[in-house]
């Protein structure tokens, strides 16, 4: 199956919302990062949420069974760099792996950390 289940993390009913996790570069050069979270792809321009992140990881509670994208804006020394990533936040019914009714949430992890500085 390739999917490991921790039965202690089960939901007894299918959740309708959960957290997406966004990893950002936060340091002395980049103390605050404007982010835009989109439903679907960034190019679809379906804005879900706009904020400024001051720590990483950044969590946002959103509806499940949806693809989300994030665009982070890094500005320093008059230069701006954008980082983009996306992932689907899913629910999965895995009761056959546990002794109880079990729903888990998978995905929803985005990494918009700078690869270089």
Go through each PLM region and give its residues.
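First exposed extracellular module after export/assembly in secreted or surface-exposed proteins
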Residues: 3-117
């Amino acid at each position: 199956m390739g999917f490991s289940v921790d039965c202690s993390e089960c939901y007894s009913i299918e959740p309708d919302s959960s957290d997406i996790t966004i990893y950002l570069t936060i340091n002395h050069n980049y103390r605050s990062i404007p982010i835009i979270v989109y439903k679907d792809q960034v190019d679809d321009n379906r804005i879900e949420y706009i904020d400024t992140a001051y720590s990483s990881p950044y969590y946002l509670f959103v509806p499940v069974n949806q693809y989300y994208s994030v665009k982070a804006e890094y500005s320093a020394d008059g230069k701006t760099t954008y980082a983009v990533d996306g992932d689907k936040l899913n629910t999965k019914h895995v009761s056959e792996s546990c002794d109880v009714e079990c729903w888990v949430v998978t995905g929803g992890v985005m990494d918009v950390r700078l690869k270089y500085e």
